């Protein structure tokens, strides 16, 4: 039926092929600094493009609603076993299609509409799914938000006071734009003191945690959710780790609760990524991720920019642009013209609108994947500062773009 030689994307759909080729060129030619993006391996992509995409497999390994699942059972069980080993978890569900759906799965399993949850404020670095009023989590539940103190660290004392006052059923830890280490043990004690579950969303930090360069929340939390891309460098998807006592309700919440048939080709990609993350090379990579982020932040500070929280202890940093009298939206556009990709991001107590912002968020995972070290991280920091010092100067943009081209040529993503 299908001739592999003839059924190529280029032959079947030249328009899609052209868009893919253009995106590949963009990824090779631009320096990627969006903290939630990374480059996955050819092995992971091959798994995602395999015949496993053809197979329906409602249920779980050994308990499927379809026949012919003996081989996809092997794939899913390998993914489960590997991710449990990677993070030291008692149980795992690898079927969530995203980090948001992983969070929804925990909510669906353990909460009822109207229950009180407590999460980090989106305005202070949290995530939409931690109780934002525009998200399902903020519409279905009564939300209490904690945030940062005057030093721009998590205000654990205020969080404890809020928990004592409001008695949430579930406390959410984790962030999407917070650079310091989170004290998961302290948050677990707060949760225990009020009889709340603790759910940690480690989506941004998962790769660092797997390598032991960031605190592991698994020993302290009832549930730990994550994406499988970002710093973990796998396919786009989600995972829930949990204590064994919660495995049955979580599994039921994912299927049949909020999802149908799992994406077995993506689960295969997850399994491959987990195997890669168990390697010594992955630990060395994550150590470089943290070092590159530190060098990048220090370089920006030397050039007159402020890092929210004063520093980074992870892969990510939030840059306050107000001293340069430029918005996040304008900075994103200017840097993009120089082939440096970032995202505009609100800073704590940001006076600008969400589509404008006073900051940008930067991350080091992708540039580290392509081989950048501290010297390149310092160079990138100076290139960013050069653009932000003269964001409307065409000559500056052209000069920086030429230096970016030299860097990306030296360090290709896919050889």
Curated annotation (Swiss-Prot):
It catalyses: (6R)-5,10-methylene-5,6,7,8-tetrahydrofolate + glycine + H2O = (6S)-5,6,7,8-tetrahydrofolate + L-serine. Keywords: Amino-acid biosynthesis, Cytoplasm, One-carbon metabolism, Pyridoxal phosphate, Transferase. The modification N6-(pyridoxal phosphate)lysine is found at residue 230. Pathway: One-carbon metabolism; tetrahydrofolate interconversion; Amino-acid biosynthesis; glycine biosynthesis; glycine from L-serine: step 1/1. GO terms for molecular function: glycine hydroxymethyltransferase activity; pyridoxal phosphate binding. PROSITE patterns: SHMT (PS00096). (6S)-5,6,7,8-tetrahydrofolate binds at residues 122, 126-128. It is an enzyme of class 2 (transferase). It is found in: Cytoplasm. Its EC number is 2.1.2.1. The record marks 229 as: Plays an important role in substrate specificity. Its cofactor is pyridoxal 5'-phosphate. GO terms for cellular component: cytosol. The keyword Amino-acid biosynthesis applies. InterPro entries: PyrdxlP-dep_Trfase, PyrdxlP-dep_Trfase_major, PyrdxlP-dep_Trfase_small, Ser_HO-MeTrfase, Ser_HO-MeTrfase-like, Ser_HO-MeTrfase_PLP_BS, SHMT-like_dom. One of its GO terms (biological process) is tetrahydrofolate interconversion. The keyword Cytoplasm applies. Belongs to the SHMT family. Homodimer. Catalyzes the reversible interconversion of serine and glycine with tetrahydrofolate (THF) serving as the one-carbon carrier. This reaction serves as the major source of one-carbon groups required for the biosynthesis of purines, thymidylate, methionine, and other important biomolecules. Also exhibits THF-independent aldolase activity toward beta-hydroxyamino acids, producing glycine and aldehydes, via a retro-aldol mechanism. This is Serine hydroxymethyltransferase 3. It comes from Burkholderia lata (strain ATCC 17760 / DSM 23089 / LMG 22485 / NCIMB 9086 / R18194 / 383).
């Amino acid at each position: 039926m299908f001739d592999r030689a003839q059924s190529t994307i280029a032959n079947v759909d030249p328009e899609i092929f052209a868009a893919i080729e253009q995106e590949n060129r963009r990824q090779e030619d631009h320096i990627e600094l969006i903290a939630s993006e990374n480059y996955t391996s050819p092995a992971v992509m091959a798994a995602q493009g395999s015949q496993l995409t053809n197979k329906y497999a409602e249920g779980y390994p050994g308990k499927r609603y379809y026949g012919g699942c003996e081989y996809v059972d092997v794939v899913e069980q390998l993914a489960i076993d590997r991710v449990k080993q990677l993070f030291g978890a008692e149980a795992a569900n690898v079927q969530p299609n995203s980090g948001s759906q992983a969070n929804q799965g925990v909510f669906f399993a353990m909460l009822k509409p109207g229950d009180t949850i407590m999460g980090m404020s989106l305005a202070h670095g949290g995530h939409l799914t931690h109780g934002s009023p525009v998200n399902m989590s903020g519409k279905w539940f009564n939300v209490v938000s904690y945030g940062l103190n005057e030093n721009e660290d998590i205000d654990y004392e205020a969080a404890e006071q809020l928990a004592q006052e409001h008695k949430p059923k579930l406390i959410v830890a984790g962030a999407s734009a917070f650079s310091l280490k989170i004290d998961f043990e302290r948050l677990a004690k707060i949760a225990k003191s009020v009889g709340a579950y603790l759910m940690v969303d480690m989506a941004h930090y998962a790769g660092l945690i797997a390598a032991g360069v960031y605190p592991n929340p698994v020993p302290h939390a009832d549930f730990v959710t994550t994406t499988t891309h970002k710093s973990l460098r796998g396919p786009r998807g989600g995972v829930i780790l949990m204590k064994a006592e919660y495995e049955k309700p979580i599994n039921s919440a994912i299927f049949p609760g909020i999802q149908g048939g799992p994406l077995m080709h993506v689960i295969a990609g997850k399994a491959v990524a987990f195997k890669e993350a168990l390697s010594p090379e992955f630990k060395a990579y994550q150590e470089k991720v943290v070092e590159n982020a530190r060098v990048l932040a220090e370089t920006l500070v030397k050039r007159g920019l402020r890092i929210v929280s004063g520093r980074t202890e992870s892969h990510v940093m939030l840059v306050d642009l107000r001293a340069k009298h430029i918005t996040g939206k304008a900075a994103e556009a200017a840097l993009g013209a120089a082939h440096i990709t970032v995202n505009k991001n609100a800073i704590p107590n940001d006076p600008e609108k969400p589509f404008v912002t006073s900051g940008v968020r930067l991350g080091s995972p992708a540039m580290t994947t392509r081989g950048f070290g501290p010297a390149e991280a310092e160079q990138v920091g100076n290139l960013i500062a050069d653009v932000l010092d003269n964001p409307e100067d065409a000559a500056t943009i052209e000069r920086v773009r030429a230096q970016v081209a030299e860097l990306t040529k030296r360090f290709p993503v896919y050889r």
